[in-house]
Amino acid sequence: MLELRGKKVSDGIKEYVSKELETLSFVPKLAIVRVGENPDDMSYERGATKKLKSFGLDVASYVFPQDISDEAFKKAFKDINEDDEVTGILLLRPLPRTINEKYIENMIDPKKDLDGISPINIAKVFAGDTSGFSPCTAEAVIEVLKAYDIELTGKRVTVVGRSMVVGKPVSMLLLKENATVTMTHTRTVDLKKTCSDAEIVVAAAGRAKMLNSDYCGQDAVMIDVGINVDENGKLCGDVDYATLDGKASAATPVPGGVGTVTTAVLAKHLIQAAKMR
C-alpha cells in the first residue's frame, strides 16, 4: 500500500510560494483570529504560524477573551478586516455562542477570506468558479490526489461527511475534476457498500476509526481528513489505517497526511490574496 504522505505535497506548494514571493513587492501577512483558549484552535494556530513563517510569510495572531461581547468582537474584527497591512484572514471557529458567527462570515472581505467561509466564496465553490477561495482542507484533498497522480476523471468517489468545512465543498471540487461523486454521512443506509463500491473514499465524518477495511474496495484509495483522539489518547483519523494493508492501493496517514497539506494550502491562498491586490 502506498502511503500518501503530506510532506511531498506541502513541499511542492512551498516551491510555488517561494517563486511567487519573488514577484511581490511586499511580504503578505496573515491574521489569525482566535477567541478563547480552545486547545485544538491553539494547536492549529501554532502549526499554521510555524508553516507559514517557514514559507517566508508574515503571521500575526489576534487573540480575544472567551467572554468578549458580540459588539466588541464585531468592532475588533472590522478593524482587522479593513487593515491594509493584513493580506488574508483565518478565523478559528466555532466562535462562542455569544458571538453572531453568521454576521462575521458576511462581514469578512471575500478577497481576504482564505478559508472560504464568506457566502460569496462558498457560492463560487458551488458554482465551480475558481476565482474565490475554497476551504483549505477541502482543497488539500485535491492537492494530495493530484500530487500523487491519482486520476479523478470518471472515477467513482464516495465522500463520507456533509459539513460545509469539508464534505460539501470537497464534493464540489471533485465534481469540477469530473469525478462521479456520491455524498454520504453517518446516517446513510448501507454506508459500507457505498464506500466499498467506490474507487476513492474521502473520509470526513469526524468519528475516530469509523471506517475499516470493510469499507474499502480492493485497490481503492482512502483519503482520511479526520483528526480525532483514540481510546489511548493518540491522534487518529476517521479510517482505521492499520486494517487497510492488502486492501487499499494507497491511503493518507493521520497524522502526516491531509492535515500537513491544509496549512500549505493556506500559504498558497495568502499568496493568491496578495496577487489580487
Region roles according to the model:
Residues 1-26:
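Positively charged, low-complexity intrinsically disordered leader regions
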Residues 27-37:
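Short beta-strand segments enriched in small/hydrophobic residues
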Residues 35-49, 132-221, 230, 234-245:
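Glycine-rich phosphate/diphosphate-binding loop of Rossmann-like nucleotide-binding domains
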Residues 52-66, 181-183:
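Short beta-strand elements in bilobed, periplasmic/extracellular small-molecule ligand-binding domains
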Residues 72-84:
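Short, well-structured alpha-helical segments in soluble
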Residues 88-152:
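Anion-binding alpha/beta catalytic cores of soluble intermediary-metabolism enzymes, centered on
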Residues 92, 204-205, 224-225:
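Short, well-ordered coil/turn residues at beta-beta hairpins
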Residues 102-123, 223-277:
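Rossmann-fold NAD(P)-binding glycine/threonine-rich loop
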